[in-house]
Curated annotation (Swiss-Prot):
It comes from Mus musculus (Mouse). Transmembrane segments: none annotated. The gene is Cdk10. This is Cyclin-dependent kinase 10. It catalyses: L-seryl-[protein] + ATP = O-phospho-L-seryl-[protein] + ADP + H(+); L-threonyl-[protein] + ATP = O-phospho-L-threonyl-[protein] + ADP + H(+). Disulfide bonds: none annotated. Pfam families: Pkinase. The modification Phosphothreonine is found at residue 196.
Amino acid sequence: MAEVDLESDQIRLKCIRKEGFFTVPPEHRLGRCRSVKEFEKLNRIGEGTYGIVYRARDTQTDEIVALKKVRMDKEKDGIPISSLREITLLLRLRHPNIVELKEVVVGNHLESIFLVMGYCEQDLASLLENMPTPFSEAQVKCIMLQVLRGLQYLHRNFIIHRDLKVSNLLMTDKGCVKTADFGLARAYGVPVKPMTPKVVTLWYRAPELLLGTTTQTTSIDMWAVGCILAELLAHKPLLPGTSEIHQIDLIVQLLGTPSENIWPGFSKLPLAGQYSLRKQPYNNLKHKFPWLSEAGLRLLNFLFMYDPKKRATSGDCLESSYFKEKPLPCEPELMPTFPHHRNKRAAPAAAEGQSKRCRP
């Protein structure tokens, strides 16, 4: 058992062998972790699934980092399990297109924990809202290839992100795109264990999740990839639903009504009988993107397969002829530079809830 004396700044631990407490020396109380005092907070840049994020400077190295404060407000018994999952996953992940967890640092009285992450100057949601002109198709391909490479690495390591969206895709000044915010991520195995369907931001949520499946595979990430690709191409969200019922209806309007023929097991999903789906026999992707090449439409259709077992994998996408035809993907270092919105503005108190691109 531990006691913290806030007035004297002392931490006392109860001795097991002898009655009473002993004081932990200041030089030992943080263990191997550094103190957050060694970082200068520059400004608040956002709010992830389970914590506030700051731009900060490491006073020892002068490096600019992202400092994510772990939410502890609802916890009485230590670190939230969601944060433990995120820390555990990120510590084992090392890939150019995955945000890097550099270290974990602690607050003054050990009551707060911060994740020190690699800093990226932009997030795609802010870019899409503030860009004077949309990304070119060559730039979209450059972004998507990086997203897919990072995702292929995750899936090969048996990890599902479960919250892919444009606001969780970061970009450095050198055009390197990194997937961030692993607060909802899960490791999976065989057989696949049941998981809650209430994951993935609504606009990017796969139909099987909307219909209540608890069997989650990497295919839910791939549906979100399709939504992201379409959003980058159109410069606006593809399926901006306001409720789960509305979201399903938007999907049906775009892709047609699902059936047992194209999606075996569809009628047995937990919520399939609760929705009265409109009869819509047509796939309208081509009408939505009349200028897109046949290869581009094939890729979108592959990502938007109703049947999760038939949906494109990250490997399938990386081999797509869409990325091999003109306009070819530009090199990351040739991506345009933009004003540093994350450096200059303090993020709103509920950034995800207020952003036009980050609603439910």
